[in-house]
Design a protein with these regions (language model features):
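Helical element adjacent to the flavin cofactor pocket in flavoenzyme catalytic cores
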Residues: 208-250
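Mid-domain catalytic core of redox enzymes
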Residues: 241, 245-358
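Active-site-proximal substrate-binding core of FAD-dependent oxidoreductases
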Residues: 476-478
């Protein structure tokens, strides 16, 4: 649906395009400052990357994109908002994460560092030495990590983190740990970077996800991830913010007059939406690199997944990929344009802990793997084979399957170019390029800002890209 012609007499202080977590966070911050704000969203519902739908059968509530939210509950901005008053309830599984192995056991990321370490045999001491400082000072670390690269507020803690984060995930795992269990666990955590695990900087996301699991958990949203967007939207309305859905904005010239415009879009979309950008800036946008895509599968099940390792039933998130070596090979191949028969699979089983997700006596689950950007290869059989590998009899539980290839993810969310759910490559080069400018959010067109996950601090349902972009806009207005 295209936005109807807008009355030229309409105006407001701020306009935001895109009602995903970053767009809504930006709108909330602007409204808190007393600005009149209007948000335009192309889809009929708010949420962007946090949406929930009955993809398989009636009564089965599937998270279409993001499903588990360690950075949502940890967000320095979102946690200051009264989202619980507007329907957001976090549910924690007993353990944040399970990583089953072929020997029939599972490596568990527990809420307790000590309990996790005990599961790592001879690497218990090394694990505690690596992780405990970050967990102890989690709030300080999160505050510095979830913002543009700058002088840290807590230099001692950040330097300790940075010395390890700058390393490759595989290099850190092989140096710090001697056994296969700890190495496999960290490989799975590092794979959230969507980078080759032997590339510098890939350890950073692994460390953040690990520390978050201990400090704040990896919760799911009761009723579905959609509740996050709905709660943000509801709170925005209490601040007199307006949201217009079903409004596709192809050009900022379609928008009402405003003092500032914030765009929750990626660089290629920005290029199409804004006229008059300097040639050099246009060339930079055209050179912007998107990362691998995702191939996602959702299942309606007639019972819980029959894991060989019973511990897997204690975690809402399960990593399926086996050893460090297997995961490194799978993720590296994606960057060379290859598909693997044994992909690293990130699986969520929300209905084990949230009964609102499936009809009584039934269950749902979802999983995805990384694929080359824009891939047209159907990975369903390979994903299901990885589940079956650690849960024999899984296929017999499937009632209905729904596939979400990269093309469908992009159709449902225009920011997912080629199925890239992160908004671009999340590597050190991009971090430095975007953070060493005067502002990574401001464009050369006065009053126009970008607030998507293509800006620092990058991917994740934390709203901090939107928050920092709004702060930059407010600074200009003042």
């Amino acid at each position: 649906m295209t936005l109807p012609q807008i009355d030229a007499s309409q105006s407001c202080d701020a306009v935001v395009v895109g009602a995903g977590p970053n767009g809504l966070a930006a709108a909330v911050k602007l409204a808190q400052a007393g600005l009149s704000v209007t948000v335009f969203e192309a889809r009929s519902t708010v949420g962007g990357g946090v949406c929930t739908s009955e993809l398989t059968l009636p009564g089965f509530q599937h998270d279409v994109f993001a499903a588990v939210h360690p950075l949502g509950i940890a967000s320095p901005f979102l946690r200051t908002l009264p989202l619980a008053e507007h329907g957001l309830e976090w549910i924690h599984s007993p353990a944040p994460l399970a990583h089953p192995l072929d020997d029939g056991t599972a490596v568990m990321l527990e809420r307790s560092v000590e309990a996790t370490a005990q599961n790592l045999e001879k690497d218990a001491r090394a694990y505690k030495k690596l992780v405990e400082p970050f967990v102890k000072h989690w709030d300080d670390l999160a505050g510095d990590v979830l913002r543009p690269l700058s002088l840290p507020s807590h230099p001692l803690q950040f330097s300790r983190f940075g010395l390890r984060a700058i390393r490759s995930a595989s290099g850190l795992a092989e140096t710090v740990f001697g056994g296969p269990r700890a190495r496999a666990l960290f490989a799975g955590l590092g794979a959230h970077s969507i980078m080759p695990l032997d590339r510098l900087g890939s350890a950073a996301i692994g460390l953040v996800m690990c520390a978050a699991g201990h400090a704040v958990g990896w919760p799911i949203a009761k009723g579905g991830s959609q509740r996050i967007g709905e709660a943000l939207a509801a709170y925005l309305r209490t601040l007199n913010g307006e949201i217009v859905t079903g409004a596709t904005i192809d050009s900022i010239e379609m928008l009402p007059k405003a003092r500032v415009i914030l765009l929750d879009v990626t660089p290629w979309q920005l290029l199409r939406m804004v006229r008059g950008l300097p040639d050099g800036y246009q060339r930079k946008l055209k050179r912007y690199r998107y990362g691998p895509g995702a191939f996602k599968v959702e299942w309606a099940l007639d019972g819980p997944i029959p894991w060989r390792a019973a511990d897997c039933r204690r975690a809402a998130t399960v990593h399926l990929g086996g050893t460090l070596k297997e995961i490194v090979q799978a993720e590296s191949g994606i960057w060379r344009g290859r598909h693997t028969d044994k992909p690293f699979v990130l699986l969520t089983q929300q209905s084990l802990f949230d009964p609102t997700r499936a009809p009584e006596g039934k269950h749902m689950a979802g999983a995805y793997c990384h694929v080359p950007n824009g891939s047209g290869v159907d990975m369903t059989a390979h994903i299901e084979a990885q589940v079956e590998r650690f849960a024999p009899g899984f296929r017999d539980r499937i009632v209905k399957t729904h596939k979400l290839p990269p093309s469908e993810l992009e159709r449902l969310n225009a920011n997912c170019i080629g199925g890239d759910i992160a908004g671009g490559i999340q590597n050190l080069r991009r971090l430095l390029q975007t953070s060493l400018r005067g502002s990574p959010y401001a464009t050369p067109v006065g009053g126009v800002y970008v607030c998507s996950s293509s800006t620092p601090p990058g991917a994740g349902v934390h709203g901090m890209c939107g928050y920092h972009a709004a702060v930059a806009a407010l600074r200009r207005l003042s």
